[in-house]
């Protein structure tokens, strides 16, 4: 599926004022158009001025790339960012979420929330009268997935029919990769140990969203998962909040390290992705991370360009 570069604004017009809580919130055509707008912003073919709009960040989880990329994205669009750390606001003293969301809607033009429970994000979206963006929850990481597929598109030239193999924990990142990949016509394979699979309801949702006969598969053999794949992806084995499970997970994921041996089973021209931060020597070897196949730091940069496009779309800046 392709969108005429001149037709991007028309396709994205319906996103003005919308929330982005899940990759499934937008249509396949809108997802493709957001990637095209991201490309235009990155290349300098398109410039957008949001006229001093304000983004409010509510992050209850630690963040480097998401926080900085949102701040820089808003600055490059001519806007400002207010960092609403719960530790230094009344949120940390028990102010009800619904009150905070309504008050911030009077001060800000858009809100990005990074938290543990998806329900908390949904509650912000319910009570806020401004667009709410998912900056990560335990269920999904949609901005990351958009940046991932922009990176794959840049490296491979197209998305439809490509195969992305994710090896590791069936976590929030795997959920968003399945949903976004399905909308873009990408075959997504999840390779994980038994008991660490993505949620069945998300797998079913992705399969129902799939276009261009994209296949969503889950398998327990990492070699089968990566065999012939054009893009390989991994993430930490223990996400934030799971640190107490680290030793158990290290044992369970033995054999799932994205190293040179595993990479050898992929397409000879395969690229390697990781959403960072990485634990070298655990889920990915240092050699693969620094090798010729790695597009990991291009991938990190693309968070900026995707989030610029997203902010411009939901704020009607096109």
UniProtKB/Swiss-Prot annotation:
It comes from the Bacteria. It is found in: Cytoplasm. Belongs to the aspartate/ornithine carbamoyltransferase superfamily. OTCase family. The keyword Cytoplasm applies. This is Ornithine carbamoyltransferase. Transmembrane segments: none annotated. Its EC number is 2.1.3.3. Keywords: Amino-acid biosynthesis, Arginine biosynthesis, Cytoplasm, Transferase. One of its GO terms (biological process) is citrulline biosynthetic process. Reversibly catalyzes the transfer of the carbamoyl group from carbamoyl phosphate (CP) to the N(epsilon) atom of ornithine (ORN) to produce L-citrulline. It comes from Prochlorococcus marinus (strain MIT 9313). InterPro entries: Asp/Orn_carbamoyltranf_P-bd, Asp/Orn_carbamoylTrfase, Asp/Orn_carbamoylTrfase_sf, Asp_carbamoyltransf_Asp/Orn-bd, Orn/put_carbamltrans, OTCase_ArgI. Pathway: Amino-acid biosynthesis; L-arginine biosynthesis; L-arginine from L-ornithine and carbamoyl phosphate: step 1/3. It catalyses: carbamoyl phosphate + L-ornithine = L-citrulline + phosphate + H(+). The gene is argF. L-ornithine binds at residues 172, 235, 239-240. Its main location: cytoplasm. One of its GO terms (cellular component) is cytoplasm. Carbamoyl phosphate binds at residues 63-66, 90, 114, 141-144, 275-276, 303. It is an enzyme of class 2 (transferase). One of its GO terms (molecular function) is amino acid binding.
